[in-house]
Amino acid sequence: MKKMSIEAFLNWAFTKELCKVGSGSNVGLASIPSSWGMIGSYAALGTMIDRSPNGYGVIPDFIEDGLPHADAVRAGDAVRRLTSVALDIPEGWNPFPEWADDHGLVAAEVERVRAEVMIKGDRLAGRHVAALVTTCVLLNRGPDWQASKPRETMIADKDGTPRWFCQKTSKDAFGRSYTIETDGYNRRARKPHRGAYHKYQLASSIRGAILDRMEWQQWQAALSILAADLKNDLLAHEILPFEPDLEPWASEEKMQECA
């Protein structure tokens, strides 16, 4: 039994074995005996032979032929079973614990994106998880979670003057009270209204960084599922124990605390 990490095993299965699925003897070694033959075909036709992914999401190899290893097929089937998995994002999820957030801007944006993802649902569906795993396996790396916090700036007028805001309470036609945010600057007195305040905003969007860290955690959760699923189901391989690293960015937080 060959011992392998779940990541290495999946990479082997998808890049070395499952590419044989759908290759067919008519387009495999019989018709294109080498990579040079493939280059020759390109020179003659002016284009590469078009290929669609096989049932495992892998482009069939022009060179490889024959049947894939039985363990690789088990790996491919396990990844396909991820389509039945449904993931969730808990309330209060904090993918940036290493960032200072004195004005709550990061938390507010994370919650906005979380709510958007929960409503749409496509990024939490098993189909997305299976596709994410296939992509990461083929690239031999997980999603890039590295991110730097953008600057916080005061909301300002076009001339750069910081704007003032204040809250006022009013009543509707039914006598119910509600609060609205209005201009906090008294232009007649040329000074802010009592209780007026400045507001801050992030200088650039962090939506992409939020989704990247969400996908990192999905990738790790999926690896846990696959490692457990394949643990006792292989003929010639043994999956090493796997401990998901859901927050690799936490080490950066610790480094900042010690600095």
What positions do the PLM features span?
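N-terminal interaction/assembly modules
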Residues: 1-124, 141-259
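Short, well-ordered alpha-helical segments
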Residues: 129
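A short pre-motif secondary-structure segment
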Residues: 132-133
